[in-house]
Amino acid sequence: MQNLSILLVCSFCILGHVSSAGIRIGNELKNKKLLWMRCYSKDDVIGPLIIPIGGHRFNYFGTNIFATTRFMCTLRQGPNYRHHQNFTAFKLYSASDDGGVWDWRAREDGIYLKIKAERGVN
């Protein structure tokens, strides 16, 4: 019985990971600049975290059945983290949208996005 419980828990974790959406924030800044990150939705808060140069942070989450899942993020860098940008880091567009992984890269000249679909379409 204990083995069955463990198997069920592992199965739910794997299925949740496979079917979930997510955000990836990567630090591609130069000159050893650290990246401060904080993201939030209606129900969750991620961070604040410090991402080292060349580092990244993955956050996977399930979307709601009403297709209203949205995450907002703030990234800060520079002396005393004075330079900052607020943006919508994840948003569903319809009930049939699974979201995929929104891959953000912070660079010296801006913040760049690549959306990776979960169904093998890039």
Curated annotation (Swiss-Prot):
Transmembrane segments: none annotated. Pfam families: Self-incomp_S1. InterPro entries: Self-incomp_S1. Coiled coil: none annotated. The gene is SPH23. It is found in: Secreted. Belongs to the plant self-incompatibility (S1) protein family. Residues 1-20 form the signal peptide. This is S-protein homolog 23. Glycans are attached at residue 86. The keyword Glycoprotein applies. GO terms for cellular component: extracellular region. Keywords: Glycoprotein, Secreted, Self-incompatibility, Signal. Its main location: secreted.
